[in-house]
C-alpha cells in the first residue's frame, strides 16, 4: 500500500482548502478521493485539513491527528450529513491477536506483536478523539477498510 502522490481533482470547486495541494498516502486514499470528487451527492470535501488533538497511550503526550477526509454529502431532499473518514487496512482496526504474542523461538514477546499493539493503541486514541470531535458537531465518524472500498 506504499503509494503516494498529489491528487488533482476534476471538480476543484468542491474541495475546501487548496485543491493544488491534496496529498494521498495510499492507493486506497487515491481511489476514495476519485470517488468523492466525482460523486454528485458530495457537496464538499477536504483531506487532512483539520487537526484533532489526542492523548497518545504510548508516551502520554498530546499529539495531532489529521483525518483522511471530511465531507458533506446529500442524503435526501434538502438533507445533508457531514462525515469524517479514516481509510485504514482492516488489520489495523482490530486489536492484535494475543495468540501471536510469544511467537519467537525464545518465547519472548515478538517485535511484530509489540508494533501491532502500539499501532492499534494509537489508532484507538485518535479515533476516540475523532468521535468526540464529530459528536460535538453533529457529524459522523467512520473508518473505511478494503471491504468498503471493494478491494
Language-model segments: which ranges?
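Electrostatic, structured charged patches in enzyme active sites and in nucleic-acid/phosphate-binding
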Residues: 1-151
